[in-house]
């Protein structure tokens, strides 16, 4: 990149440097653009040919910058963007920051689920039929999950291959609520099955 910049500046030197003469080419005493010295760019008066002064205008600087940017290898720019993204990915804690306020809510939901779940397990132990029906329903649900369509399996494998775990974070947030709903549905479903058997 430095070589490209030096080449561009060498081309611009012949067009933009002015001769040291006392003649003024403009009738206005004030120049239209502020002249900029080349000394910050590493060019000094000793390196310039005799009779040239190191004054360059803003359009010439802009042309040099745009010419340099235009000749940079695109793969180099893509590599720099990838490096920046990789560095940002290792230090990005936004997902964790989003989970921190949700952790107390999840704890509260789990606390509220625990006692009814223990009561349900005790009832199911006392009633063997309910326990068998519960096993049957859970087996049916498990078999339904195992017989998922290949498209859904392919999509889940694609998600698993990616490094983006936002879906998992959202699932962790929603999973207790889904469990609570299923838990509340289970007892009425068991009651309905018992009524159907007794009739």
Curated annotation (Swiss-Prot):
Membrane disposition: Multi-pass membrane protein
Lumenal side: 86-94, 151-168
Domain of life: Eukaryota
Annotated GO MF terms: manganese ion binding
Stromal side: 116-129, 190-199
A Pfam cross-reference name: PsbY
InterPro entries documented for this protein: PsbY_plant, PSII_PsbY
Cellular compartment(s): Plastid, Chloroplast thylakoid membrane
GO biological-process terms attached to the record: cell redox homeostasis; photosynthesis
Propeptide, residue positions: 129-154
Tissue localization of expression: Leaves. Not present in stems and roots.
Induction note: Photocontrolled. Steady-state concentrations increase for the first 3 hours of illumination and then decline.
Role of this protein: Loosely associated component of the core of photosystem II (PSII), it is not always seen in crystals. PSII is a light-driven water plastoquinone oxidoreductase, using light energy to abstract electrons from H(2)O, generating a proton gradient subsequently used for ATP formation. PsbY-1 and -2 are manganese-binding polypeptides with L-arginine metabolizing enzyme activity. They are a component of the core of photosystem II. They have also a minor catalase-like activity since they cause evolution of oxygen from hydrogen peroxide in a reaction stimulated by manganese.
Other observations noted: The central hydrophobic segment (residues 130-150) does not form a membrane-spanning region but could serve as a targeting signal for processing of the precursor in the thylakoid membrane.
Protein name: Photosystem II reaction center proteins PsbY, chloroplastic
UniProt organism field: Spinacia oleracea
């Amino acid at each position: 990149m430095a070589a490209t910049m030096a080449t561009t500046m060498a081309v611009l030197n012949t067009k933009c440097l002015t001769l040291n003469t006392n003649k003024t080419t403009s009738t206005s005493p004030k120049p239209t653009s502020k002249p900029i010295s080349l000394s910050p760019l590493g060019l000094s008066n000793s390196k310039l040919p005799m009779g040239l002064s190191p004054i360059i205008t803003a359009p010439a600087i802009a042309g040099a910058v745009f010419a340099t940017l235009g000749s940079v290898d695109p793969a180099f720019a893509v590599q720099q963007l990838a490096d920046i993204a990789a560095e940002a990915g290792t230090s990005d804690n936004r997902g964790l920051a989003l989970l921190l306020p949700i952790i107390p809510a999840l704890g509260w939901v789990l606390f509220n689920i625990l006692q009814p779940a223990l009561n349900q397990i005790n009832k199911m132990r006392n009633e063997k039929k309910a326990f068998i029906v519960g096993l049957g329903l859970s087996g049916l649900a498990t078999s339904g999950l195992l017989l998922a369509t290949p498209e859904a399996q392919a999509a889940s494998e694609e998600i698993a291959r990616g490094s983006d775990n936002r879906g998992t974070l959202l699932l962790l947030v929603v999973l207790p609520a889904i469990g609570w709903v299923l838990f509340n549905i289970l007892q009425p479903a068991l009651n309905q099955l018992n009524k159907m058997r007794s009739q």
